[in-house]
Each structure stands twice: as structure tokens, then as C-alpha cells.
Amino acid sequence: MIEPLLCGIVLGLVPVTLLGLFVSAWNQYRRSSSMPDWE
């Protein structure tokens, strides 16, 4: 049996992690598209 606390932590961390990755990727894409000579 999976502990309810562990299950809650996983269910809470997964969306936050995906959201963080999406936001960082979006910021990098927007930054590179707005400033082509960023590198």
C-alpha cells in the first residue's frame, strides 16, 4: 500500500515540476525568439 502522505506529495510535486519546466522552456523560447543574438 502506498502511504497517503507519499501519494499526496507525489501528486503535489508532479504538476509543479511540469509547470516549472514548461515556464522555463517558454521563457527560454520567448527570450531566444525576441533576441536572436542572445547567445
Curated annotation (Swiss-Prot):
Membrane topology classification: Single-pass membrane protein
Record Pfam families: PetG (PF02529)
SUPFAM superfamilies (alphabetical): PetG subunit of the cytochrome b6f complex
Alphabetical keyword list: Electron transport, Membrane, Photosynthesis, Thylakoid, Transmembrane, Transmembrane helix, Transport
GO biological process, one term: cytochrome complex assembly
Localization annotation: Cellular thylakoid membrane
A GO CC term attached to the entry: cytochrome b6f complex
GO MF annotation, one: electron transporter, transferring electrons within cytochrome b6/f complex of photosystem II activity
S-S bonds: none
Membrane-crossing segments per the record: 5-25
Domain of life from the UniProt record: Bacteria
Oligomeric form and interacting partners: The 4 large subunits of the cytochrome b6-f complex are cytochrome b6, subunit IV (17 kDa polypeptide, PetD), cytochrome f and the Rieske protein, while the 4 small subunits are PetG, PetL, PetM and PetN. The complex functions as a dimer.
Family per similarity comment: Belongs to the PetG family.
Function per UniProt: Component of the cytochrome b6-f complex, which mediates electron transfer between photosystem II (PSII) and photosystem I (PSI), cyclic electron flow around PSI, and state transitions. PetG is required for either the stability or assembly of the cytochrome b6-f complex.
Protein name: Cytochrome b6-f complex subunit 5
Origin organism lineage: Bacteria, Bacillati, Cyanobacteriota, Cyanophyceae, Synechococcales
Gene, per the UniProt record: petG
